[in-house]
């Protein structure tokens, strides 16, 4: 059995991750669940909090206190929290599955450095459908090449705090790499006022926030006389959680390295 710990187990995504881990029993088992220090929920059964019934795993407020109880940590928390957990797992030799978004270049470099010592799967989106979309985007960009104007439109719920989404940025990276462009130089984030004509090599991003939208992403390849749209719509966060658990299983006995969901699915 793959022993899995969930960080942020009392949060919206954390409770779904707890459920997803339990759904894969006996291949996986939730053996630790961590919440923020000082939380009033410390000691509460993680299964009961996730409406699964009692599973015998009390919420802990300290990762170090459960270090001997898990093999891999699933972490979808904020960047500053995740990086502290990364440092601990690197020192303790624990594998990680990381779904944190909003990382800057320096923070991503810390992930790469940690990957020299422990196996890590880091992805902006753990949905199988999204990762298949990334493969399709690579193909479309290479075939359409300079003939298409490319725009990425994403929509999420009102509570999401980073924009564009990590998934939208990853889509942009895949397209830019396929076209041998530097995304930092060609990305255009929103348009307003008198912008002038569209520069041909740019990749545009548009962001929508509202309601309870789980996650919609559309990439538009606009050519002369035709348009190609590649769209993915998530209707439940469980799709992300199931992908994260799949990644945790894939990491079993894996050599140290920084992997992504494309590696897990064999799409590279």
Curated annotation (Swiss-Prot):
EC number: 1.17.1.8
Binding site for NADP(+): 36
Catalytic reactions on record: (S)-2,3,4,5-tetrahydrodipicolinate + NAD(+) + H2O = (2S,4S)-4-hydroxy-2,3,4,5-tetrahydrodipicolinate + NADH + H(+); (S)-2,3,4,5-tetrahydrodipicolinate + NADP(+) + H2O = (2S,4S)-4-hydroxy-2,3,4,5-tetrahydrodipicolinate + NADPH + H(+)
Family annotation (Pfam families): DapB_C, DapB_N
Keywords per UniProt: Amino-acid biosynthesis, Cytoplasm, Diaminopimelate biosynthesis, Lysine biosynthesis, NAD, NADP, Oxidoreductase
Residues annotated as the enzyme's active site: 156 (proton donor/acceptor), 160 (proton donor)
CDD domains assigned: DHDPR_N (cd02274)
SUPFAM superfamilies to which the protein is assigned, alphabetical: Glyceraldehyde-3-phosphate dehydrogenase-like, C-terminal domain, NAD(P)-binding Rossmann-fold domains
Pathway stated in the Swiss-Prot or TrEMBL entry: Amino-acid biosynthesis; L-lysine biosynthesis via DAP pathway; (S)-tetrahydrodipicolinate from L-aspartate: step 4/4
Compartment(s) where it occurs, according to its Swiss-Prot or TrEMBL record: Cytoplasm
Domain of life: Bacteria
Positions with a binding annotation for NAD(+): 8-13, 99-101, 123-126
One Gene Ontology cellular component annotation held by this UniProt entry: cytosol
PROSITE patterns in the record: DAPB
Main location: cytoplasm
HAMAP family (alphabetical): DapB
Family, per entry: Belongs to the DapB family.
Name of the molecule in the record: 4-hydroxy-tetrahydrodipicolinate reductase
